Amino acid sequence: MHTVLILGAGFGGLELAACLSESVADEARVVLVDRSDSFMFGFAKMDVLFKGATEDSVRIPYRDLVRPGVEFRRETVTSIDPRTRRVVTDRSEYEPDTLVVALGADYEPGATPGFVEDGHEYYSIDGVGRLRARLDDFTGGRVLLGILSVPFKCPPAPYEGVLLLHDELVRRGLRDRTSIHVLSPMDSPIPVSAETSTALVEALAERGIEYSPGRLVHALDPSAHRARTRAGELDYDLFIGIPKHRVPDVVEASGLTVGGADGWVAVDQRTLATPFPGVYAIGDCADAPVPRAGVFAEDAARTVAAVIAARVRSTPQPEVKYRGRGACHIEFGGGLVGKVDADFLSGPAPVAPFVAPSAELAREKAEFAAARRRRWFTG
């Protein structure tokens, strides 16, 4: 029986496992490996940070995954040899017929001097806990949010964070004593969508949040609580950063990043195949021309699933093309959610129309999560 090994049970890995369960459950053995015991939507961290949700309430245990033909194993990958498709974990060794690397991106906070010592982030659940504790003690002052490197996961997330922070400070009666300033190395919040960028910039301005595009924080001075940029230094009482992203160490050591831009895994942009036969990469670790976001990993998984199904059945490869399509919901605060519906690769140029914030889209976002939980874990 054909064995498919999927490394990583995030958006891409879970969607791929679901697709293969639907198409080749009787013809292939699908092994899904992840070091964690549970899945968490990235946007759920905002619920923990700002909406009173507990960490346990937003975790979905992998033990609940009962997809036909799919076996979940909680293991940590220690080495990958893409030439032989040999994978070693802390518990097992594998040599599958097809290997899919969906291990996402790790964070490198130490890449920005001073950030580890004097900064906060909300991209990891541990970072959320530390920032929540800091906010509980916060009584006002200067808040800086800096995007410390590109690319990074979920491009709207820095702006969602400050909009929700604004709401919290208003509720607590602290907004009048707090300044909020966003610094980004990019020229606009969402470069592919002028409509979305305009909506976010206007939302910041309406709330008195300063926005400085094209400005990178390259270091913090922890003793002086000062952020350094080429245009000068800025004082802060609370610094929140979007840390540098990179492939996990085990992926870098495998040689899969050779030929990929900026240290990401080199892939065929149509099929997500790597230069190594039978090896594919999807999601945040792949050097595909789309943002790092779960919806694009989902779309990549569907593309790769069609290719793998043909491999399993020994039929001609289908004429597939990764489209880079996905809709991202954006928190604007006040219970309103907007949406950008992007298509990067189907046509001659990317298109990404924006849908204005509404309570209806907030309900749609909740159903987005519920539908995926049903699909990925129970079918």
Where are these regions (language model features)?
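Beta1-alpha1 glycine-rich phosphate/pyrophosphate-binding loop at the start
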Residues: 1-71, 149-191
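Local beta-strand N-terminus motif with an aromatic residue
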Residues: 2, 96-97, 236-237
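FAD-binding beta-loop-beta segment adjacent to the flavin cofactor pocket
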Residues: 263-279, 332-344, 350
